[in-house]
Regions:
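C-terminal membrane-cytosol helix-exit motif in multi-pass small-molecule transporters
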Residues: 1-26, 227-232
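A membrane-interface helix-boundary motif in multi-pass transporters
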Residues: 119-122, 202-221
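Juxtamembrane intracellular "pre-TM" segments in multi-pass secondary transporters
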Residues: 12-56
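A late C-terminal transmembrane helix in Major Facilitator Superfamily
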Residues: 175-207
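C-terminal ends and interior cores of transmembrane alpha-helices
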Residues: 129-142
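Extracytoplasmic gate region of multi-pass secondary transporters
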Residues: 51-106, 162, 166, 194-198
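Cytoplasmic membrane-interface "Motif A"-like loop-to-helix N-cap segments
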Residues: 113-128
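Intracellular juxtamembrane helix-capping segments at the cytosolic ends
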Residues: 160-174
């Protein structure tokens, strides 16, 4: 990349990508130009670090990764030791947890565009309620069918806020800052989210029992819903600001 790659288009003498692609999509955050004189660090500090909306949407990913890795990492051991599943039964529940994500991610973007007018967070909050209920069922049930179905629901629904938060991140910042915003979200999700879902869950489960680990996951559900709600308020605020600016223009 260092030999063949370059900077942004205008660093190479080309017009901005919005002009090249003739993108007609209306952005929430509109700038007069792409601030061609700003370095990557300046973009990060001015458009990412200071934007509370970017932090909220990044922590959506933190909490969803906490839930996903908490279930994914500890599902085999939990089902074998606590629920008394055989290895084949455990493998079935594990496979359903993973494969159930495919239809939900395919439909999530279409549903938000069609029925929620491009609003990403309402559907995310709805699916997170389902995730919380499914975790409780997965935690308390004992028969194979119920536990497997609950694991499938968690796997199906948890990927919806993960996917939609990635879309929302791009929409919350100017086009030239989308890469930095996505990078922050990815960094936090792995440093905090996956670490909490694996290591912290394990420590709590070992010291205080499996229930402590599941309380951590339910805390993550509540925290994620809160961040989705605050992100949604931020989107509505940006839309009002954009409408007001259009009237005065």
């Amino acid at each position: 990349f260092s030999l063949c790659g370059g900077g942004r288009t205008y660093n190479e003498g080309l017009p901005p990508m919005s002009e090249i692609l003739q993108n007609d999509h209306e952005e929430l955050v509109v700038t007069k130009n792409e601030n061609i004189n700003l370095s990557t660090w300046q973009i990060f500090t001015q458009y990412i670090v200071k934007d509370i909306n970017v932090w909220f949407v990044s922590f959506i990913d933190v909490f969803t990764y906490m839930i996903r890795f908490g279930v994914l990492t500890w599902l085999p051991l939990y089902l074998l030791e606590t629920k008394g599943f055989t290895k084949k039964e455990m493998a079935l529940a594990f496979a359903i947890f993973e494969w159930a994500a495919i239809p939900s991610t395919l439909l999530a973007g279409y549903v938000t565009d069609t029925y929620f007018k491009g609003k990403r967070m309402p559907l995310s909050m709805m699916t997170l309620v389902g995730v919380g209920l499914a975790i409780i069922v997965y935690w308390s049930a004992s028969d194979l069918t119920t536990v497997t179905a609950a694991a499938g629901v968690v796997g199906c629904l948890i990927y919806v806020p993960m996917f939609l938060s990635s879309l929302q991140t791009i929409e919350l910042v100017p086009a030239f800052a989308a890469g930095s915003a996505t990078g922050l979200r990815g960094l936090l999700s792995y440093l905090l989210g996956s670490a909490s879902g694996t290591a912290l869950f394990g420590v709590l489960a070992e010291r205080y029992g499996w229930s402590a680990g599941f309380y951590l996951l339910l805390f993550a559900v509540v925290g994620c819903i809160f961040c989705c709600f605050m992100t949604h308020l931020g989107v509505l605020r940006l839309e009002r600001q954009k409408a007001a600016a259009a009237k005065t223009a």
